[in-house]
């Protein structure tokens, strides 16, 4: 099974783009060359701010969704403190208990 990664790319205007891939370097190069996500085209210099393995595609999609819901401040904390990402990942792997 090919592992999936979650990554954050910082744009020249300091915004953070979140994505998932099985090959971070390849995907980053696609974004750099303008062949990646339209959201990053024409955004100036791009920097890979964060990447981490998340497991399978299903978990990667859930992690991407959760990170995209975070505020800019929370995303910056995630980039600065990888422990925060471990907590996020752990919460996605734990089944939620629904109460009626």
UniProtKB/Swiss-Prot annotation:
InterPro entries in the record: GIY-YIG_endonuc (IPR000305), GIY-YIG_endonuc_sf (IPR035901), UPF0213_domain (IPR050190), UPF0213_GIY-YIG_endonuc (IPR022992)
SUPFAM superfamilies xref list: GIY-YIG endonuclease (SSF82771)
Residue intervals of the GIY-YIG domain: 2-77
PROSITE patterns assigned to the protein according to its UniProt record, in alphabetical order: GIY_YIG
Highest taxon, organism lineage: Bacteria
S-S bonds: none
CDD domains, A to Z: GIY-YIG_UPF0213 (cd10456)
Family, similarity comment: Belongs to the UPF0213 family.
Alphabetical list of HAMAP family matching this protein: UPF0213
Protein's name according to its UniProt entry: UPF0213 protein YhbQ
Source organism (scientific name): Escherichia coli O139:H28 (strain E24377A / ETEC)
Gene: yhbQ
